[in-house]
Amino acid sequence: MNIEVLKSKIHRVKVTQAELHYVGSITIDEALMEASNIIENEKVQIVNINNGERFETYVIKGEKNTGVICLNGPAARKVAVGDIVIVIAYASMDFEEAKKWKPTLIFPDANNRLI
């Protein structure tokens, strides 16, 4: 039996941009992607701390070490610049394997930089 488990989490980053008329996605600083083990085009869940919204989209690689967190397309309506969000990726794995699984969690600073 396979179950979904937490794979990666970028905890409490600040939304730096919201681009409504861009094809949907979230643009994430490449340094944050690398540290969290999230790859381009991966499906992620976004949880907005400020308004309680939860939604899914996919990842676009942003310029490295810029701190960019940009919600694009319709997702831009679910955030405001300055909102704090959590980015979560999940993986499907065997139940027994999942018992031993350790997700990758990162906790960037207030400027979306690695600590």
Swiss-Prot record:
**Which GO molecular function entries does the Swiss-Prot or TrEMBL record give?**
aspartate 1-decarboxylase activity
**Pfam families xref list:** Asp_decarbox
Its pathway, per UniProt, is: Cofactor biosynthesis; (R)-pantothenate biosynthesis; beta-alanine from L-aspartate: step 1/1
Q: Where is the active site?
A: 25 (schiff-base intermediate with substrate), 58 (proton donor)
Query: Which InterPro entries is this protein grouped with?
Result: Asp_de-COase-like_dom_sf, Asp_decarbox
Q: Which GO terms describe its biological process?
A: alanine biosynthetic process; pantothenate biosynthetic process
Cofactor binding, note field: Binds 1 pyruvoyl group covalently per subunit.
Organism superkingdom? Bacteria
**Which cofactor is essential here?**
pyruvate
User: What catalytic reaction does the record list?
Assistant: L-aspartate + H(+) = beta-alanine + CO2
Q: What does the PTM comment of the record read?
A: Is synthesized initially as an inactive proenzyme, which is activated by self-cleavage at a specific serine bond to produce a beta-subunit with a hydroxyl group at its C-terminus and an alpha-subunit with a pyruvoyl group at its N-terminus.
Its top-level enzyme class, in one word, is lyase
GO terms for CC?
A: cytosol
The listed locations are:
Cytoplasm
The record's annotation in CDD domains points to: Asp_decarbox
Keywords for the protein's UniProt record, in alphabetical order: Autocatalytic cleavage, Cytoplasm, Decarboxylase, Lyase, Pantothenate biosynthesis, Pyruvate, Schiff base, Zymogen
Coiled-coil spans are: none
Its family remark reads: Belongs to the PanD family.
* Quaternary structure note: Heterooctamer of four alpha and four beta subunits.
Main function: Catalyzes the pyruvoyl-dependent decarboxylation of aspartate to produce beta-alanine.
Q: What is this protein called?
A: Aspartate 1-decarboxylase
